């Protein structure tokens, strides 16, 4: 039995994570096509490790949700979350993982938008930042459409396909967020 959605758009629902969610997250995490440009998933994760990771996300400094397409309520296609929430400086890191099987249908963009609305409206954060591979054109375009802008790069920070690539740092401030 799945929980009710916490946040919902016309394409995606953000569902509270359950301790048993490693069952659906592990195959997505271990899919090389899904994690091609990510830090997560570069090495396989066993189910027990996945369960421990999900348990570690249940803390006052993290808000992580499973992603379900609206038309397939019982299906999970990834996660989105705010990590390292700093309650003094009012900031957090945003991370998202969407199964490669559902790329290109707007789930990632809408989940990002819903998470930003949650961060700025409910948590009253001032800043949300992220990092992504400079060669991940799809993610860069999605984040820019949601209002993130590049703040800088960690040069030759990530090893991909036989060479080092830059890690792009992007951020958005509460005052800049327009609900994308």
Regions inferred by a protein language model and the residue ranges of each:
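A general structural signal for well-ordered secondary-structure junctions
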Residues: 34-35, 63, 125
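Sparse recognition of residues in long alpha-helices and their boundaries
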Residues: 41-42, 66, 159
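Acyl-donor (CoA/ACP) binding surface of acyl/acetyltransferases
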Residues: 1-22, 27-31, 71-180
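Conserved GNAT-fold acetyl-CoA-binding loop/helix
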Residues: 33-54
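Short helix-loop boundary/capping segments at the starts of domains
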Residues: 31-34, 59
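A short helix-loop-beta-strand connector motif used in the catalytic cores of GNAT acetyltransferases and
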Residues: 54-66
